[in-house]
C-alpha cells in the first residue's frame, strides 16, 4: 500500500491510497532513492547527434526567471534562509516534510509571500501564508507518516516587502522582511488553521528578524 498526496495551488488537499498487487511468484522491483547530484550549471544539453544545444544554466534562465511569481519566489526565499543559516551547500529536496535542517538539527519551514505579483493588480496583495498540518513524507522511504501535523520545529515567514514595481528585485535581500515563530506557538495560536495573514502572525507574537540575525535568533527561539 502506498499513499499519494494531492496538492492544488500549493495546498495539501487529500491523501489517496493505492494498493500494489503482487502476483504469485512475481518479484517486485526495487528502486532505491536516487542520490541527488548538485549541478554547476555548465553541464551541456545534448542533442541526439551528440552536439550541445545549450547549457543547464540556459534552462534555469528559461524556466526559473520569474522570481516575482509565487513558485520561484518561494524557492528563492528558501535559498536566502539557507544562506543565512550557512547550509546553502546542501541540496534542496522537493516535497520533503520540511524545507531546511540546521546544523544542530532544527527543522525549518520557510513560507513566502509578497505585495507585488507578476500579473496586473488592482491593489497590492495582502501577505498570507499556508500553515496547514500535513502528513509528513520521507523522501528516502517514499512513505507518509500516519499523524497529520506541522512537520517543522520553527517557521520562517519571508515577505518580499517592496511595493514599487520599477525597482522590485527579490535578489536584493534588503527588500525582504523575516518573521520567526516556533511551530509549538503556531499550534497553540492557530490550531488546524490552513492559512494565516501577516497581521495575525504579528499579533500572535511572531518575531521580526533581520537577515543577518536569522541564524542566531532561530537558535535562541528554539532554546526557550
Locate each region found by the language model:
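Nucleic-acid endonuclease domains
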Residues: 1-106, 111-224
Amino acid at each position: 500500500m502506498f499513499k499519494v498526496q494531492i496538492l492544488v495551488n500549493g495546498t495539501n488537499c487529500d491523501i489517496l491510497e493505492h494498493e500494489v498487487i503482487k502476483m504469485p511468484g512475481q518479484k517486485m522491483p526495487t528502486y532505491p532513492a536516487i542520490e541527488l547530484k548538485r549541478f554547476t550549471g555548465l553541464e551541456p544539453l545534448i542533442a541526439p547527434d551528440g552536439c550541445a544545444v545549450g547549457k543547464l544554466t540556459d534552462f534555469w534562465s528559461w524556466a526559473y526567471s520569474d522570481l516575482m511569481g509565487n513558485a520561484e519566489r518561494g524557492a528563492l526565499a528558501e535559498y536566502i534562509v539557507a544562506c543565512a543559516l550557512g547550509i546553502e551547500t546542501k541540496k534542496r529536496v522537493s516535497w520533503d516534510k520540511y524545507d531546511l535542517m540546521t546544523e544542530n538539527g532544527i527543522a525549518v519551514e520557510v513560507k513566502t509571500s509578497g505585495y507585488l505579483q507578476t500579473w496586473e493588480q488592482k491593489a497590492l496583495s495582502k501577505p498570507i501564508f499556508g500553515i496547514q498540518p500535513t502528513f509528513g513524507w520521507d523522501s528516502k522511504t517514499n512513505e507518509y507518516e500516519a499523524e497529520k501535523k506541522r512537520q517543522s520545529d520553527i517557521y520562517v515567514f519571508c515577505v518580499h516587502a517592496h511595493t514599487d514595481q520599477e525597482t522590485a528585485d527579490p535578489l536584493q535581500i534588503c527588500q525582504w522582511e523575516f518573521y520567526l515563530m516556533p511551530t509549538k506557538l503556531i499550534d497553540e495560536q492557530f490550531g488546524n488553521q490552513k492559512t494565516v495573514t501577516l497581521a495575525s502572525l504579528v499579533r500572535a507574537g511572531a518575531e521580526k528578524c533581520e537577515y543577518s540575525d536569522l541564524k542566531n535568533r532561530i537558535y535562541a527561539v528554539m532554546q526557550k
